[in-house]
């Protein structure tokens, strides 16, 4: 089974721009840097039926 991780990506205004799903957690930080974002949270998910792109303020 392949583990999937979902990350919320934030721009400099701290708004969520998109969600990135990757198969390996250790690729996450590099991907986020490549895309020019400065913050992310990763969460393992066991299955995905679908996901929506959200734009909302970051909650601390």
Residue locations for each model-derived region?
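A short, exposed loop/beta-hairpin motif centered on an aromatic-Gly-Thr core
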Residues: 14-26
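Short amphipathic alpha-helical segments that mediate assembly, nucleic-acid/protein binding
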Residues: 2, 25-28
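Short aromatic-glycine-(Arg/Gly/Cys) micro-motifs in beta-strand/loop hairpins
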Residues: 1-15
């Amino acid at each position: 089974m392949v583990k999937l991780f979902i990350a919320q990506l934030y721009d400099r205004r701290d708004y969520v721009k998109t969600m990135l799903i990757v198969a390996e957690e250790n690729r996450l930080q590099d991907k986020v840097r490549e895309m020019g974002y400065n913050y992310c949270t990763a969460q393992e998910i066991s299955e995905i039926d679908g996901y929506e792109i959200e734009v909302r303020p970051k909650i601390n």
